[in-house]
Amino acid sequence: HGDLVDEQAHAYRLFSWRSVEVANNDVLTVFAGMRLSNDKFSSLLRKYRTLVEAGVDVRTPDGYILRASCIGFTKKLNANRKACYAQQSKREEIRNAMINTMRDLISSKNIADLCTEIISETMEKEIINKCQTIMQIDNVYVTKIKVIKAPVYTVEELKKLHQGRTVQK
């Protein structure tokens, strides 16, 4: 994953790629999933905050069916109070906002654009902006994207998908 981002501080997203075809010296791969590293996930957990998790199954325009999971925490606003908990109704509203945002953004992007969007954290920023009116949240991350169903590509389609995209050794 170090090849996907410029800074190692942002290398906590672990992408999985599945090898499909070997053509000459090139290995053609397809997206197989993404998850946060265990170190990053463990560092997010905090006391005196409410954890909100959401998950949704979404179909991309290029035929993938993905299961995306998201996590977020309430943000401490008052410096005098130790805890910052959310009521159940607020948690449900935040969860619905997370689900709707993930569904909208994933269903409108093909898998290559989705990977670049995940790396640039635009989905997380969009979720934080949508939840501003409900309750302040922070540490929002897409924790996992699992491929439920992937389209079957021919060799020609794979070569067309990989045109102009090479990773040097």
Feature map (PLM): residue ranges:
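Positively charged, low-complexity, intrinsically disordered RNA-binding extensions
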Residues: E92-K169
